[in-house]
Regions:
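Hydrophobic anchor at the beta1->P-loop junction of P-loop NTPases
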Residues: 43
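Interdomain motor-coupling "hinge/lid" segment immediately C-terminal to the ATP-binding subdomain
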Residues: 2-7, 147-257
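Conserved lysine of the Walker
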Residues: 51
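Hydrophobic positions on the alpha1 helix immediately C-terminal to the Walker A/P-loop
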Residues: 54
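Accessory nucleic acid-recognition modules appended to NTPase machines
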Residues: 3, 72, 212-370
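Structural recognition of the conserved hydrophobic beta-strand(s) that form the central parallel beta-sheet
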Residues: 134-140, 161
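N-terminal pre-Walker A segment at the start of P-loop NTPase domains
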Residues: 1-30
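Short glycine-rich substrate-engagement loop in P-loop NTPases that contacts/grips substrate
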Residues: 75-104
Length: 434
């Protein structure tokens, strides 16, 4: 690759680039943890969720606390069009260009969207093996969260998940502070106002900057199209674009609902359209890997049962729901989707429960030892109270859980469910701030 291009980009970073004003992210690693970084640190999450700004936050912290100077750091965005032809063998040319401009090797490597490089894991492993660099990478592919990536990097790897703003971070964006006392004062109205907007707009940082619903919707539509074309069609060389688009559209409209590959395949056959179940399973995996959807399996101790049953689909950000039907028709499902995202953010494993009754979430901790049953609805009414309670109780009884949780828009109470069983009702917004 042309070294002049690399020198230009390095010089832009060293001399011209000003770190932007930042909204601190809760999930960002702190400088003290980075100072003696010995592993490869991967910042992973959806496109446009703020991964680059998290890297900026890390760099700013290192510089402000005196752990590094600007010329100790090499930052490069591999989605820059000037790097479209960058190959693994160009890495030495890159370091040579840096040395010519600074007189030394970089101590820190910040490589944004690293998965754009062919055989990137081999390249990063080779750099790490030299023992000269502290390495931070980012990527918009959920495969970077999978164990096989850690295996490829010989276990010298840990990931850090960055999603669009949480509700807590959205309050920070709007410069609204809160304490537990706020929940019981008139200032609670400000929290609910922002929460209402959060349910309709989501947490993509650039979307929050837009003033009108039309501008926000257009930007979300652009994100949707970019995920489809760049993160799925181009990355996986999809030939049956209409089939892939049909599945993505189906998932968009079926958020917080069950999705059956068998039923989808039958629908294709009835319309005389091609699409094997294996192909559909691959396409569903691509949507997950592109951070467009989350999938929850049916709760079962049998791996076969988990695989054979339909999956429950959730969108990675509630803002995408604005591309579908009217908000008022989907309020309960939107709350459920928001809960799923937060569980994923907290790196908790969750399934749905479905027997004769239904419960929205069975949540497991990291060791899969402690279980929690959670039901989600917009409000408890005379029409749905019995159904929601019976579904939650069925899960609690089968799994021997003494406590259950119902999350609603803004209700709070404690329900004596049965002997030795207790059910708490709590507002979703308060749970999100916990």
């Amino acid at each position: 690759m042309n070294q002049t291009i690399l020198k230009t980009m390095i010089a832009e970073w060293l001399e011209e680039f000003a770190l932007p004003a930042l909204i601190p992210r809760d999930a960002a690693p702190v400088p003290a943890d980075l100072r003696n970084l010995s592993e490869i640190l991967a910042i992973v999450g959806p496109r446009r969720a703020g991964k680059t700004f998290v890297m900026y936050q890390m760099i700013a912290g290192l510089i402000e606390q005196g752990f590094a100077g600007r010329d100790d750091i090499l930052f490069l965005d591999f989605e820059d069009y000037r790097l479209r032809d960058f190959a693994p063998e160009d890495m030495e040319t890159l370091f040579s260009a840096f040395r010519q401009l600074t007189g030394k090797d970089p101590a820190w490597l910040f490589f944004d969207e690293i998965h754009q490089i062919p055989a990137w894991s081999r390249v990063i492993r080779s750099l790490h093996n030299r023992g000269r660099y502290r390495i931070v990478i980012s990527g918009s592919n959920a495969r970077l969260l999978l164990p096989d990536i850690a295996t490829e990097l010989r276990g010298r790897y840990r990931d850090h998940l960055i999603l669009p703003f949480s509700f807590k971070e959205t309050l920070r964006w709007h410069d609204i502070s809160w304490t537990e006392r706020t929940f019981y004062t008139a200032a609670k109205g400000d929290l609910l106002r922002i929460f209402d907007t959060f349910l309709k707009t989501g947490g993509f940082p650039e979307v929050l900057k837009k003033d009108s619903p039309g501008e926000r919707r257009q930007l979300l539509q652009n994100y949707y199209q970019t995920i489809f074309y760049r993160d799925i069609v181009e990355r996986y060389n999809i030939r049956a674009k209409s089939l892939m688009e049909g599945m993505m559209t189906c998932c968009l409209h079926q958020f917080s609902s069950l999705f059956s590959l068998s039923a989808f395949e039958k629908g294709l056959k009835s319309q005389r359209q091609p699409g094997s179940k294996r192909t559909l399973a691959n396409y569903l995996a691509y949507l997950q890997e592109a951070f467009f959807i989350l999938c929850a399996d049916k709760f079962s101790y049998s791996p076969r049962q988990r695989v054979m049953n339909p999956k429950k689909i959730f969108l990675i950000d509630p803002g995408f729901i604005a591309l579908t039907e009217d908000f008022s028709e989907n309020k309960g499902r939107i709350l459920e989707n928001v809960v799923a995202i937060e569980l994923y953010r907290r790196r908790q494993t969750f399934n749905y429960y479905k027997n004769r009754r239904e419960c929205d979430f069975i949540v497991r901790d990291a060791e899969s030892v402690n279980l929690q049953a959670i039901q989600v609805c917009w409000t408890l009414t005379t029409g749905n109270r019995e159904r929601e309670l019976r579904g939650l109780l069925a899960a609690m009884e089968e799994l021997s859980l003494p406590q259950g949780l119902i999350l609603t828009y803004d209700e709070e109470e404690s329900l004596p469910a049965a002997p030795s069983r207790q059910i708490a009702v709590m507002p979703v917004w308060k749970w999100l701030l916990g």
